[in-house]
Design a protein with these regions (language model features):
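Cyclic nucleotide-binding regulatory module and flanking cytosolic helices
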Residues: 2-38, 42-43, 87-88, 92-95
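Cyclic-nucleotide recognition modules
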Residues: 34, 78-136
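A cytosolic small-molecule/anion-sensing beta-strand core signal
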Residues: 42-43, 61-62, 83, 108
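Short phosphate-coordinating micro-motif centered on Lys-Gly-acidic
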Residues: 46-52
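Glycine- and acidic-residue-biased ligand/ion/polar-headgroup-sensing regions
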Residues: 55-68, 84-85
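Basic, amphipathic alpha-helical hairpins
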Residues: 124-127, 145, 168-175
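Short alpha-helical segments that sit at the start of domains
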Residues: 147-168
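Phosphate-/nucleic-acid-contacting segments
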Residues: 157, 166-226
Length: 226
């Protein structure tokens, strides 16, 4: 456990997307009446794993989490980082599949707040701005996902690779680590292994990624996108 002053809690909540725009009076009520859980994770300790039930809404207040996304067939995975302030998969808190779809592990020492479902429902009932912020967050993600099938598919192999990463990453910038064999990547991109090898070696010569056996490290996805 860790201790946090009332003033620090006010300031941290205002940084979170679900609390942006809430008045000072309402925020004072929320802090005084809401049962927050306080959590401290040391580096390398897991927060939640893929398929765990999403029974609490976690808010990353300080630190950085390592996020791991697995392919359904478990033949490859992508690792990336999520820095504070952030909310952990709020879109899975309600609906048909109320389970986390990624592993979240402390990359550095992390401080988090949590709310159980009854507290979230109470906030949704009592505070319009909180309700709108959550709806906006879920709606934006749904709108982005619904647009994906209609995008023009890239014909250039480099852009196909970038698109492959972007569709599977939680954030569109920063360091990404793809753990995949050359053969599986070729299959995913519908390209020959030789074409994949040429493309990756060119990107490595340009300093945009590094390769080792079964591991592709992209220091900055936004730079790779060009």
């Amino acid at each position: 456990m860790f201790f946090i002053t009332m003033l620090q809690l006010y300031d941290k909540l205002l940084e979170l997307p679900l609390f942006i725009g809430i008045s000072t009076d309402e925020l004072s009520d929320i802090v005084g009446q809401t049962k927050f859980g306080f959590h401290k994770l040391i580096a390398d300790k897991p927060l939640v794993s893929m398929d765990d039930k999403c029974t609490q809404l976690f808010f990353l207040m300080n630190g950085t989490l390592r996020v791991i996304s697995h392919a359904d067939n478990h033949r490859y995975r992508i690792e990336e980082e999520l820095s504070a302030p952030a909310v952990i998969q709020p879109e899975h808190f309600f609906g048909l599949m109320q389970r986390y779809t990624k592993d979240f592990i402390a990359q550095t020492d992390c401080s988090l707040l949590s709310l159980d479902k009854s507290e979230v429902l109470r906030l949704l009932d009592n505070y319009l701005i909180f309700r709108l912020n959550l709806l906006n967050s879920i709606s934006m993600q749904a709108q982005r996902m619904s647009h994906i099938p209609w995008r023009q598919q890239p014909s250039d192999i480099r852009q196909q690779f970038v698109n492959f990463l972007r569709l599977r990453c939680l954030t569109q910038a920063g360091r990404k680590v793809l753990r995949i064999t050359m053969e599986d990547l070729a299959q995913e991109l519908h390209q020959s292994r030789l074409n994949i090898s040429h493309m990756l070696n060119t990107l490595q010569r340009d300093g945009l990624l590094t390769m080792s056996r079964g591991i592709i490290t992209i220091p900055q996805l936004e730079t790779l996108r060009g």
